[in-house]
Amino acid sequence: MNVSAESGAPRRAGQRHEVGLAQLPPAPPTTVAVIEGLATGTPRRVVNQSDAADRVAELFLDPGQRERIPRVYQKSRITTRRMAVDPLDAKFDVFRREPATIRDRMHLFYEHAVPLAVDVSKRALAGLPYRAAEIGLLVLATSTGFIAPGVDVAIVKELGLSPSISRVVVNFMGCAAAMNALGTATNYVRAHPAMKALVVCIELCSVNAVFADDINDVVIHSLFGDGCAALVIGASQVQEKLEPGKVVVRSSFSQLLDNTEDGIVLGVNHNGITCELSENLPGYIFSGVAPVVTEMLWDNGLQISDIDLWAIHPGGPKIIEQSVRSLGISAELAAQSWDVLARFGNMLSVSLIFVLETMVQQAESAKAISTGVAFAFGPGVTVEGMLFDIIRR
């Protein structure tokens, strides 16, 4: 006798049983997304953190604030950052005090972003056997500049990409934008396995620097740096053998955390793009990361102990510390994130790709494949990330 799954009642022979898509087992993937090329870059200007602290302190008249500022910079655990412009330079100081309008700053962003983004994109594609026509999608991610036609159009023209290329611009997704962009590119190449996608993240926080009599401005300036990263994404048949150094994107994930809207707030003021980080953000991260990651791993037949690599967004000491604490993993597993934070500061969407690059470059002969989880945080608060494998040998 046939029985209805919903009610347990007998079902007559020949009666059609409706099955929703959600009840069907997932079809095995025929293709997987692979990071085939990766390059990073920064502006040439190196800013020493202790020097920056001393110079910022001089801007404040209140003795208490002047004494507090060096401690803020020291707690950042950042040694150096790279910047397109020095926001404490005399010329930029005049530009800032006029004050510079949002229009002025966006033109400054474009001026410095284009050559850096073009250079990094060329290096990501260097040595790969692609014709320009094979790059079918360009995804540009940034939260520090918006102008159109913008950096994406400049990349298309400078690299000689097809004028019919699809373009997606991811704006104002904050530090999580690289994962959002990567997810878009992954979906594209799996749907169009003969084509490639180029993901470019460019962040120039320095062009938006503002110093008012506000400790939030000081905290923001103590953390953020400038940088660029580019990824070339292709598709591979699941049974294909991949070369060492390739990164397989097994799955992407995104979760909007409840009641955390104040955690990360990006905005636009008359004189630039603004960022506010709530004192509640570390608590949101501690309570939110483990449930999101654990569920994603469960969906992929894994658990936290199965993960070899943890690419945690190096957004600041509390971001890394609370992520580690939430997951219950060894502090040593966040070493690459701490290293990127110390050398470059928080480069928003770019930072996580720097961490991933470090992991790819570190040889590990003990295992043929290293499995990792990468994640970052955006306004919402949103946790965006991916499960990946690095092919070692």
UniProtKB/Swiss-Prot annotation:
Substrate binds at residue 221. It catalyses: hexanoyl-CoA + 2 malonyl-CoA + 2 H(+) = 4-hydroxy-6-pentylpyran-2-one + 2 CO2 + 3 CoA; octanoyl-CoA + 2 malonyl-CoA + 2 H(+) = 4-hydroxy-6-heptylpyran-2-one + 2 CO2 + 3 CoA; dodecanoyl-CoA + 2 malonyl-CoA + 2 H(+) = 4-hydroxy-6-undecylpyran-2-one + 2 CO2 + 3 CoA; dodecanoyl-CoA + 3 malonyl-CoA + 3 H(+) = 4-hydroxy-6-(2-oxotridecyl)pyran-2-one + 3 CO2 + 4 CoA. GO terms for biological process: chalcone biosynthetic process; fatty acid biosynthetic process; polyketide biosynthetic process. One of its GO terms (molecular function) is acyltransferase activity, transferring groups other than amino-acyl groups. Signal peptide: none annotated. The active site is at 175 (nucleophile). Changing residue 318 to A: Unable to synthesize any polyketide products. Pathway: Lipid metabolism; fatty acid biosynthesis. Keywords: Acyltransferase, Fatty acid metabolism, Lipid metabolism, Transferase. Pfam families: Chal_sti_synt_C (PF02797), Chal_sti_synt_N (PF00195). Residues 1-26 are annotated as: Disordered. The keyword Signal does not apply. The record marks 205, 209 as: Important for broad specificity for aliphatic long-chain acyl-CoA starter units. Its EC number is 2.3.1.-. InterPro entries: Chalcone/stilbene_synt_C, Chalcone/stilbene_synt_N, Polyketide_synthase_type-III, Thiolase-like. Homodimer. Involved in the biosynthesis of tri- and tetraketide alpha-pyrones. Pks18 catalyzes the extension of medium- and long-chain aliphatic acyl-CoA substrates by using malonyl-CoA as an extender molecule to synthesize polyketide products. Belongs to the thiolase-like superfamily. Chalcone/stilbene synthases family. This is Alpha-pyrone synthesis polyketide synthase-like Pks18. It comes from Mycobacterium tuberculosis (strain ATCC 25618 / H37Rv).
